[in-house]
Regions:
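Exposed regions on extracellular, virion, or secretory-pathway luminal proteins
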Residues: 101, 113, 172, 179, ...
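Conserved GNAT acetyl-CoA-binding A-motif
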Residues: 157-167
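Conserved catalytic-core motifs of GNAT/GCN5-like acyltransferases
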Residues: 165-167, 185-202
Length: 226
């Protein structure tokens, strides 16, 4: 972890198709992950649930109101696929999600093999910093490297960033390894970082450079390149 549309056939057909991005909405993919701007409130809640368990929060350090605290609800959400219409799902969760104007982009990730919610990716397009997390069922399978490679791709090819940055706790060997496998290299940065829950931890930093960069139409007006 770093800071920073109940049937299988139906779920697959409702997934965003990789290609040109629409205004305010982005889609990126790797070999095993499809990541996209949430389409529904369910997508958004599943993205949050993916990083709400105790193991993830050891590293992420979100505030209590920023996580899905109920373990049974987390498990239910992370067994689902976009487009599922389970009777247990509240109707308001199927309402469309409209992206805001915040500096940070949030993408929800699903596995391409079974369509299950599996990850979340963030990119702050003012600082060029990316971050993300995997659901418990997606950890230990090399998906972290794909997730961070997607973060670099989003920064370089969607927002025109020359450099994408990432930071993690110094003792988080799994995250450091995933960043290195994704093509990030060690970089200078503050020796400590304060998590959102107030904990101060030792930090280590990475950067990802690129050749030609580009901006997709979903990125809106031009911004300074980081």
């Amino acid at each position: 972890m770093v800071w920073a549309p109940l049937r299988r056939r139906r779920a697959v057909t409702l997934l965003p198709v990789p290609g040109p991005c629409a205004l305010g909405r982005h889609t990126v993919h790797t070999e095993r992950l499809l990541l996209y701007t949430p389409e529904t409130q369910l997508d958004l809640l599943a993205a949050i649930a993916a990083g709400s368990d105790a193991e993830a929060q050891r590293w992420l350090g979100m505030r209590g109101e920023e996580v899905v605290a109920d373990a049974r609800l987390r498990e239910t959400l992370l067994r689902m696929r976009p487009g599922d219409n389970d009777r247990k799902i509240r109707r308001e969760l199927l309402v469309a999600f409209e992206p805001g104007t915040e500096a940070a982009e949030l993408l929800v990730g699903v596995r391409r093999d079974n369509g299950r919610y599996a990850a979340a990716l963030q990119l702050d397009h003012t600082t060029g910093q990316t971050g993300g997390w995997l659901a418990p069922h997606g950890r230990g399978q090399g998906l972290g490297a794909e997730l961070f490679a997607a973060g670099a791709l989003l920064g370089h090819s969607h927002f025109g960033m020359d450099t994408v940055h990432a930071g993690t706790e110094a003792t988080n060997a799994a995250c450091r390894g995933a960043l290195l496998r994704a093509g990030f290299v060690p970089a200078e940065g503050p020796p400590t970082h304060t998590l959102r829950d107030g904990r101060e931890i030792d930090s280590t930093w990475f950067r990802h450079g690129s050749g030609p960069v580009a901006r997709c139409r979903a990125a809106g007006v031009a911004q300074s390149r980081v």
